[in-house]
Structures are given as C-alpha cells and as structure tokens.
Amino acid sequence: MVLLLASPLAGLSVFYKVRKGDSLWSIAKKHQTSITTIKRINKLRTNRVYPGQVLRLTPRITKYNAPNGPYYWQKPRASRQRHRNYSERPRSSPGLDYRRAQILLRAFDNEILAKAPRKRRKPLKGWRIVLDPGHGGIDPGAIVSNLTGQKQRVYVVEDEYVYDIALRVYKELRLLGAEVTLTVISPNHLIRDNLPAKTTFVHEKNEVYNDERYNRRNSEKVRPRSANLSQRVRVANRFVKGARAGRSLFVSLHADNTPGRPMGPLVIYHKRRGRVDRRSKSFARVMRTALHQPDMPAQERGRNLAVLRNNLAHAEILVEVHNVHHQHEAYQIRYHKDRQHHAKKVVSGILAYARKKR
C-alpha cells in the first residue's frame, strides 16, 4: 500500500506499507528506486522487512508556497515572468531533474488514487493515454504580453501554462481509470494556481523528457527543444506498446500564437502528402465537438506534424487549447479556473471517443 503524506510544514514524501511476500528488492524495483536509497532514508542496517512496516520511499521534499505555486525542492528566482526574454537556467543536471520529477509524479498519482471514491465508475479502464505538454525545457513556445484589469503588463509563457493543463487532464483521466503518462515532466511543481492571476508562471528551463536513459547524458541538449521532437514519440510509443488493440491515444497540448487564425481551440489530425489518417481525423472531430463554444468555435485541420508521425497510438491529435495571439485568450489562460475548464473539456472529448469505440 502506497501512502502520500503532505503538508506545508512537513513537506511531501511517499511511503509504502510492506505486505506479506515483499522484499526490499521487489519494493525498490516496483517504485523505481534502489535498495541502497531505501536503506539510507529509513536507516536500515539489514535488508529484512516485515509486513505492516512503513518505509519512506523518497527523501522529505521541501515545499514552497507561492501565489503561483506551490513548488518543491526549489522555486523560481523571480515571482513572475519579468519580460518577454526572461528565463531561468536549470540549477540541476537533467538526470537529477528527471529523478525529482518522477518522485513528484509518483506522489501526485498516489494522492489522486488515495482520494478517489472506491465505487466511482471507471469508463477508461484498460486505456493507455499519452499526454504531450507542448514545448518545455529550452523551448518556451509562445511568449506573449497581456494586460491585467489594472492595465499592468504581464507575460504568458506557453509551455508553463499547457503543462498545468496537462496535469489537470492527467488527474481527471486517472480518476476515470486510464493509465496515463506525460512525455515531458517538471522537477519542481505539479498543478499550480495563480492567486492573483498577474503572478504569471516563470519560464524555467528545467523540464526534461520522461525517459530515464535519455537523461543520463550530462548535457543540456537532452532537454526538450525543437531539435529533438522525435523523443516525444519514442516516449509515447514505449508506453502504448503494451496497450490493448484500439485502446491507446496520444494528445499533444499547446496554446498557439497565430495572427491569421480566429479565436478558439484548434484540433490537428495527422495528414501527410494528402493522405489523411482516418483514426486521427475521427478523434479530432470528436475532440472539436467537445471543445466547441458558441462564442469561440473550435476548428479542425490536418497537418504533418513531427509528434503525430510514426506514432503508435491508435489515434493521435494535437490540441491548440487557446490562440494566445488574441488578447482575450491570453488573458483567460492566466486563470487557473479557465485551465481547469479546458482540461475537463479535453477529458470529455477523450471520453466521447472512448465511448464511440465500444
């Protein structure tokens, strides 16, 4: 049994209650850690464990509360995005950031499942879903300026906001029974609210790909950027490989900055050299319906995008949740309630497609 203990003072840690038949080796393997780490954290002298014994699986993590947080281990140096070109370099190696991100995600996942009602329906049980938060790492995506209600200039960084939406989608999908993974992960935060919304997320370059082996290289070049987009597909393909036939999906989440496109979401399906991926287009059509609003109609388009090519998921799409070129949409995405609203719409699109596949 995995437990999550968290409070602003105590920090955050993951614990495991030993069951009959468990060994230190099996516990370490299951939770992607090492026997040495577990022994050190719990001050164990031998490898013997006993049923009912509670072991700490992760070091205690310092939690930093902030208007645009919380953050874990370390928080941004700036309280908000200072200007269009502002960014903060990683303070740790890709390997360490990967390990920290994994600890956070395991804690997040355990917390979701611990709070889930036992009798809740799980219509997505048996599905494997890949969420691909756009950009991240070295690549911030779009950075646009916006004005608050008090005419104060603030800046919106695409990758930081779509990662927050991806985490909100992740949570809802897990509650519905799906197995879910992220292609890109952050080492110092989970879901974040903005209170007030003018405390915009800072462009931190610390995100990494969700791939332990890939992050062993001691180079900042392994962090997400336009030159290694194919790594997203590799992470996705590894996850969906064991899925049941027709029970895997890939959803890439973005917020584009396109002057020539009207307001509202855009769903992109895979189209290459005039040939349309029918399953991708079918999924896109269902998602477009889910995202549609009378004042901001959703659109649909076929394109040959790197994250959709050679993708082994049953159906793959890219969703531009907002077009932040428009001041109104850049204004909206700063609010966590808007991000939660769009996360639920994305989930409703996934659910609708899953029901269609029955």
How does the language model describe each region?
Residues 1, 5-6, 10-19, 23-46, ...:
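Catalytic-site microenvironment of enzymes
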